[in-house]
């Protein structure tokens, strides 16, 4: 049965931490938002409460009587002023009134002094001719204003213009009359001058007669001038009533002065000179009046022009919209009124016509009825004589009887309004109306019998009136129905308009959502591209070579997860245990499993549980600190009591000898007393070797760590990557292949987890290819460079074939040193792994200086190597019985108890010794776990002693030792290794001698020490796994040292097993010979190279050759050897490179000749960084700022808000990176012009910094800052990626985001680089 659990192992710790931080950040944001909303709610509540209290206080406020009286008086005064203003407006707009605007605008009075000789004239009446007044116009205007006040408001300006034109015309007429009068007076003056005598010596009679004549003439002239002055006074009085009041007393004074000489009975004698003077005075007065009238006329003209200009340019103010709407309503009501009147007239006309027709029909029926009655009387006498006559009379009666009355609609020509109304009405509605009216008329049909019963004409008239009233009611219903339908139509029109507006709004919103979704899709595509690159990286990291062996079985790629089954086989309880019991199994994060309750006796079990184990960092940590916990419980009445506990370790699954299954037994001791409670035999099996799953997991971890590779189109920071330049110059020796000269070739290189790079196919040997690979600055990169290689393939362009001709594999270790590079001409190998005549000229060099973390400091003294990520779990220190791991075949179950070896007495000997360490734990394995993919610096092999009486075990041991290779890994002594080094002749005697030299001296060999004392010598050396053998409880096992000792030791040591010295020496020589033969075979017959896509990028060990079947000892037990990670060679990237041997001289690399293709900028000195470059200029121009629809910054538009723009550019100070202050937009979607330009002149250091910014795609960020009294607040921010092609003065629109990442505004700016700066950057 498979236990259910949560997939915790699928979640890495960074993912869990990221998820936790995201959740915490969202929680903080939500709390901030809740606090802000609570503040807003509190503010709204306080405002609402304040407004309610103010309204309540205003309602409950008691006004004093005196204040109320004062307000009433003020209202009355205002009403009086309003009436006066209306009266003045009516006087001003009346046609007979004189425009007062002239005098008001000029600021002077139009009052003039009339001449003293003029006399007062009564005011002109309505019938007087020559007056400008039109008395009948005022009542008509008042009537019109009373009848349609709203229409008067619409046409008051036009009427004022018309009245001013009329007044101007009248004034022109007055001017012409006055001119005519002046001309007449001039003629009289000239005639008087001609008729006056030359001498004044005349008789009294002549003087009297002349004086009387002159007086009479003067009186006539005075009367004419008086009439003219009164006429002008009348005009001025009508135009300015206020001035007229002022003129009245002066007129009285003139009258009195004029009448005083008339009261004198005897007038004074006049002389001709006085008459002439009077005429001249009158003439001057008339001229003055004329000039004043002309000035008034000019003023009236100017006022008229102003009014016309104002009426044309005046906008709709002072309720113009309301007046226009009221005018429209008035016009609509007038149209409805006219239509209603027309309908009433038409209905009256139809009623009269119907009444006439019905009267004619009634008379016709009455006459017919009378004639039929008379005929019936005549025929009644003859009816008795003949039956035939009676029938004939009846027929005549029937024939002469009038037909039944049926209503036929009167067909007439409809009016235009009826036709239009009928077109608008529905056909169904008209048909229904026709049927109802027809039914009413049919119900009022009159027969002959009913006509006889009719009385006087009053009854008939009442009946027709009733019929008309019913028809009228039906028509009213139809009219109301049409009105209701009209209202419904209007409402539907309004709804359609609202829906249309909503549709436009939704279109705008959908366009915004579409733009946002498009951006999200682009971001998602970028993420997909990144994931594809990561998948490709993982895929290339797990490639395996295709081995050209016919009998090799294709083993599928191991999975990261495997099925772990635990089977309990047999239980043997102690005699002291008498109660029933059961076991519980707990492993990792899986569900707790329990066995059935069993009796206290020895018996076999058949209990199996299966765990689906997924390899992860958490599982590795668990295996290092824990195992499968088995607890023994005793059931009670209402609870369970813990009796004993133990822990099963899974470290045997990581051994080379155990592939998929092993069985052992464990002792469970009491948790209270430590007494043994039972012995449990178990079996553990996995679906596939768990070591393969760990290898796969480690490879995926390595690939995941190498994921941050810089892509071609990716914008990443240069500070996290260091470029490595790979240049392939030429291929030497192509002509030796004997190929056609037209054959095309190309070079393919495979480097780490990067995609294979193909050069262009060409027939020339000159390749001239260059490639930059960006290496992440992480620790795993250094490890990969120390243990990996780069592969080059010469490929021929052959259709449907791989076309691989030659290969070359170079280790990357020389690149890890200071100034390290790989350059020169290297010979290539053919497909069979033999040297060829083709060489490849190439160069691998860092673009900049080698990264500092690549440099590995050499320790002066050998120190213990500390691994980064231990993969094998540490031993678990738990009290349990020693056990023996027994190999079990796939189809076989072992139920028998494990057998123990007989103890051996210790004997002193000089042979190589080994010691077994005794531990009370269930897992006595390596004290320090090693990384599967981090091989030790000096890998060593360890031999375990076997009984001398069993030669089969000796052979098996020898075969196991043959699988191991001993060689030194002096990485620092080799700069570059060519593939030719793999064909060097091996020296069989050097490897064992080298190994013997590297073995510790007798003085340095660790001695056995007391188990209670710490083993100090073991701390500086690597610990090796040691097996446990099953022994009896009474046997004692002494600790032994896993390391090899020299043949001759100065002090004897106790050992578990003893052998003769001759046997030991023979065995040692045999082991050395086997190691030498294995090394020769590995160096001599190397596997060929497959096509490029199958060449591995991940580590490949030399020990991955098909292993021979290991023989099992006679005891049926497995002997543990080296841990898994010791079998991995130092170089994991190539299966063709031979082990590096320190005794051989390194292969010298020739210097690369030719021009360098890498452009490296020289480093700047501290003095050069501050040198100013006058041609290197960058200008930043801020153009416009605009709020987007629905922005949360809209409330700031109602305030007088000012703000400025701040940005960060290179290393300029904050004062040099801010704009001037400008105003905030006054309404949404209003564009504010900033028009601010900032120009920078760069130094050499700033130029280098700008180049780094552009290469790393660092964003140019801007911040919008609001200026508040005493404080500044950030409203939003935007960013722009710098590119070296900003010379075209392009305007960029930057979205301004708030803290929540929502777009609030848009800002337009221009970024311009000078031409010299562009040339320097590119």
UniProtKB/Swiss-Prot annotation:
Superkingdom of this protein's organism: Eukaryota
Tissue specificity as recorded in UniProt: Expressed at the transition zone at the base of cilia. Expressed in ciliated sensory neurons, including the amphid neurons in the head.
Record's compositionally biased regions (Acidic residues): 224-234, 956-975, 1042-1067
Residues spanning the signal sequence: 1-22
Chain segments carrying region Disordered: 108-151, 189-275, 392-418, 891-1094, 1121-1149
Entry coiled-coil feature ranges: 15-89, 274-362, 456-538
Gene disruption: observed consequences: Defective cilia sensory function. Abnormal dye filling (Dyf) in the ASI neuron and chemotaxis behavior. Shorter cilia lengths in a subset of ciliary neurons. Aberrant localization of other cilia-expressed proteins.
Composition bias type Polar residues, residue spans: 108-119, 1015-1029
InterPro entries documented for this protein: C2-C2_1, C2_domain_sf, RPGRIP1_fam
Basic and acidic residues bias: start-end ranges: 984-996, 1068-1080
GO cellular component, one term: ciliary basal body
SUPFAM superfamilies in UniProt: C2 domain (Calcium/lipid-binding domain, CaLB) (SSF49562)
GO biological-process terms attached to the record: chemotaxis; cilium assembly; non-motile cilium assembly; protein localization to ciliary transition zone; protein to membrane docking; receptor localization to non-motile cilium
Keyword field: Cell projection, Cilium, Cilium biogenesis/degradation, Coiled coil, Signal
Compositional bias per record (Low complexity), positions renumbered to this chain: 195-217, 918-927, 1127-1139
Chief location: other
Keyword hit for Transmembrane: no
Places the protein is found: Cell projection, Cilium
Pfam family of the protein (one): C2-C2_1
Miscellaneous comment text of the record: An X-box element in the predicted promoter region was identified consistent with other cilia-related genes.
Function: Thought to have an important role in cilia formation and cilia-mediated chemosensation. Involved in the docking of other MKS/MKSR proteins localized to the transition zone of the cilia.
Stated family: Belongs to the RPGRIP1 family.
Protein name per the record: Protein fantom
Organism per entry: Caenorhabditis elegans
């Amino acid at each position: 049965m498979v236990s259910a659990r949560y997939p915790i192992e699928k979640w890495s710790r960074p993912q869990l931490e990221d998820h936790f931080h995201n959740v915490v950040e969202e929680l903080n944001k939500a709390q901030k938002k809740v606090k802000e909303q609570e503040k807003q709610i509190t503010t709204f509540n306080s405002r609402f409460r304040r407004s309610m209290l103010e309204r309540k206080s205003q309602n409950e406020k008691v006004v004093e009587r005196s204040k109320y009286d004062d307000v009433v008086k003020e209202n009355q005064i205002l009403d009086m002023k309003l009436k006066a203003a209306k009266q003045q407006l009516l006087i001003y707009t009346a046609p007979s009134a004189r425009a007062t605007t002239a005098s008001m605008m000029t600021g002077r009075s139009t009052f003039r002094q009339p001449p003293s000789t003029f006399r007062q004239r009564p005011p002109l009446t309505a019938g007087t001719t020559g007056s400008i007044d039109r008395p009948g116009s005022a009542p008509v205007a008042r009537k019109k204003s009373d009848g349609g006040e709203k229409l008067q408001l619409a046409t008051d300006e036009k009427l004022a213009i018309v009245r001013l034109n009329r007044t101007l015309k009248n004034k022109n007429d007055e001017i012409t009359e006055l001119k005519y009068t002046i001309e007449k007076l001039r003629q009289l003056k000239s005639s008087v001058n001609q008729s006056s005598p030359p001498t004044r010596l005349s008789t009294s009679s002549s003087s009297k007669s002349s004086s009387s004549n002159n007086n009479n003439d003067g009186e006539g002239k005075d009367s004419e001038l008086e009439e003219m002055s009164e006429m002008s006074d009348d005009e001025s009085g009508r135009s300015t009533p206020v001035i007229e009041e002022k003129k009245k007393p002066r007129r009285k004074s003139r009258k009195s002065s004029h009448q005083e000489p008339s009261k004198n009975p005897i007038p004074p004698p006049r002389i001709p000179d006085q008459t002439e003077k009077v005429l001249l005075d009158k003439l001057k007065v008339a001229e003055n009046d004329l000039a004043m009238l002309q000035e008034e006329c000019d003023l009236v003209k100017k006022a008229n022009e102003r009014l016309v200009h104002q009426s044309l340019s005046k906008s709709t103010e002072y309720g113009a919209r309301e007046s226009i709407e009221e005018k429209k309503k008035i016009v609509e009501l007038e149209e409805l009124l006219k239509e209603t009147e027309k309908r009433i007239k038409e209905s009256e006309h139809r009623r009269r016509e119907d009444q006439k027709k019905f009267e004619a029909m009634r008379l016709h029926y009455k006459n017919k009825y009378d004639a039929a009655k008379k005929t019936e009387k005549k025929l009644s006498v003859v009816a008795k004589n003949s039956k035939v006559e009676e029938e004939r009379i009846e027929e005549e009666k029937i024939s002469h009887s009038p037909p039944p009355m049926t209503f036929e609609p009167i067909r007439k020509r409809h009016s235009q309004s009826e036709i239009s109304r009928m077109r608008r009405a529905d056909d169904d509605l008209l048909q229904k109306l026709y049927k109802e009216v027809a039914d009413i008329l049919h119900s009022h049909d009159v027969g002959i019998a009913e006509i006889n019963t009719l009385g006087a004409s009053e009854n008939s008239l009442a009946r027709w009136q009733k019929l008309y009233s019913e028809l009228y009611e039906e028509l009213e219903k139809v009219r109301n129905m049409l009105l209701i339908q009209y209202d419904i139509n209007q409402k539907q029109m309004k709804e359609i308009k609202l829906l249309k507006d909503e549709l436009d709004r939704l279109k705008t919103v959908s366009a915004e959502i579409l733009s946002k979704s498009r951006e999200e899709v682009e971001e998602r595509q970028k993420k997909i591209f990144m994931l594809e690159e990561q998948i490709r990286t993982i895929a290339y990291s797990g490639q395996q070579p295709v081995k050209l062996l016919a009998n090799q079985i294709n083993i599928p790629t191991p999975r990261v997860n495997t099925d772990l089954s635990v089977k309990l086989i047999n239980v043997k309880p102690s005699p002291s245990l008498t109660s029933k019991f059961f076991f519980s199994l707990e492993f990792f994060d899986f569900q707790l499993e329990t066995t059935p309750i069993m009796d206290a006796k020895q018996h076999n079990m058949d209990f199996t549980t299966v765990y689906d184990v997924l390899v992860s960092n958490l599982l590795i940590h668990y295996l290092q600190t824990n195992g499968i916990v088995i607890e023994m419980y005793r059931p009670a009445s209402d609870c369970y009591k813990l009796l004993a506990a133990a822990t099963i370790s899974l470290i045997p699954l990581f051994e080379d000898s155990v592939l998929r299954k092993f069985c052992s037994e464990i002792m469970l001791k009491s948790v209270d007393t430590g007494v043994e409670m039972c012995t449990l035999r178990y079996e553990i099996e996995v679906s596939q070797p768990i070591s393969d799953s760990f290898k796969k997991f480690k490879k995926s971890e390595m690939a995941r760590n190498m994921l941050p590779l810089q892509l071609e189109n990716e914008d990443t920071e240069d500070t996290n990557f260091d470029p490595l330049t790979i240049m392939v110059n030429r291929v030497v020796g192509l002509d030796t292949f004997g190929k056609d000269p037209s054959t095309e070739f190309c070079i393919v290189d495979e480097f780490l987890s990067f995609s294979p790079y193909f050069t262009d196919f060409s027939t020339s040997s000159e390749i001239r290819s260059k490639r930059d690979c960006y290496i992440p600055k992480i620790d795993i990169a250094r490890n990969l460079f120390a243990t990996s290689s780069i592969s080059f393939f010469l490929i021929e362009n052959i259709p449907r074939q791989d076309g691989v001709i030659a290969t070359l594999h170079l280790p990357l270790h020389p690149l890890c040193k200071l100034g390290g590079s790989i350059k020169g001409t290297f010979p290539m190998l053919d497909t069979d792994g033999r040297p060829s005549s083709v060489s490849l000229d190439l160069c691998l060099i860092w673009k900049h200086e080698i990264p500092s973390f690549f440099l590995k400091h050499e320790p002066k003294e050998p120190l213990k190597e500390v691994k980064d990520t231990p993969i094998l779990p540490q031993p678990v220190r738990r009290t349990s019985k020693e056990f023996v791991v027994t190999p079990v075949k796939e189809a076989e179950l072992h139920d028998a108890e494990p057998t123990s070896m007989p103890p051996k007495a210790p004997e002193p000997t000089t042979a190589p010794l080994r010691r077994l360490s005794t531990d009370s734990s269930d897992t006595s394995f390596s004290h320090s776990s090693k990384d599967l993919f981090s091989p030790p610096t000096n890998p060593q092999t360890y031999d375990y002693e076997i009984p001398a009486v069993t030669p089969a075990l000796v052979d098996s041991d020898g075969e196991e030792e043959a699988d191991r290779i001993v060689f030194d890994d002096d990485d620092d002594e080799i700069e570059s290794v060519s593939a030719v080094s793999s064909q060097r002749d091996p020296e069989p005697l050097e490897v064992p001698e080298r190994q013997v030299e590297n073995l510790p001296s007798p003085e340095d060999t660790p001695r056995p020490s007391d188990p209670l004392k710490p083993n100090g010598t073991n701390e500086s050396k690597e610990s090796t796994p040691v097996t446990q053998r099953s022994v009896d409880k009474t046997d004692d096992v002494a600790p032994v040292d896993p390391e090899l000792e020299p043949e001759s030791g100065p002090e004897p040591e106790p050992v578990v097993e003893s052998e003769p010295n001759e046997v030991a020496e023979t065995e040692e020589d045999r082991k050395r010979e086997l190691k030498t033969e294995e090394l020769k075979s590995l160096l001599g017959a190397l596997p060929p190279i497959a096509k490029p896509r199958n060449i591995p990028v991940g580590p490949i060990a030399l020990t991955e050759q098909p292993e021979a079947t290991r023989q099992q000892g006679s005891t049926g037990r497995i002997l543990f050897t080296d841990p898994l990670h010791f079998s991995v060679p130092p170089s994991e990237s190539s299966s063709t490179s031979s082990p590096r041997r320190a005794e051989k001289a390194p292969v010298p690399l020739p210097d690369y000749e030719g021009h360098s293709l890498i452009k490296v900028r020289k480093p700047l000195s501290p003095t050069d960084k501050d040198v100013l470059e006058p041609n290197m200029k960058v200008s930043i121009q801020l153009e416009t700022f605009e709020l987007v629809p629905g922005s949360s910054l809209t409330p700031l538009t109602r305030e007088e808000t000012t703000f400025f723009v701040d940005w960060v550019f290179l290393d300029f100070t904050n004062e040099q990176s801010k704009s001037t202050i400008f105003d905030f937009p006054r309404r949404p979607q209003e564009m504010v012009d900033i028009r601010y330009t900032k120009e920078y002149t760069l130094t050499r250091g700033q130029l280098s910094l700008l180049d780094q910014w552009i290469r790393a795609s660092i964003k140019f960020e801007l911040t919008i800052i609001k200026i508040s009294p005493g404080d500044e607040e950030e409203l939003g921010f935007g960013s722009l990626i710098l590119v070296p092609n900003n010379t075209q003065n392009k305007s960029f629109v930057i979205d301004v985001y708030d803290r929540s990442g929502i777009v609030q505004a848009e800002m337009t700016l221009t970024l311009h680089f000078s031409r010299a700066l562009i040339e320097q950057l590119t």
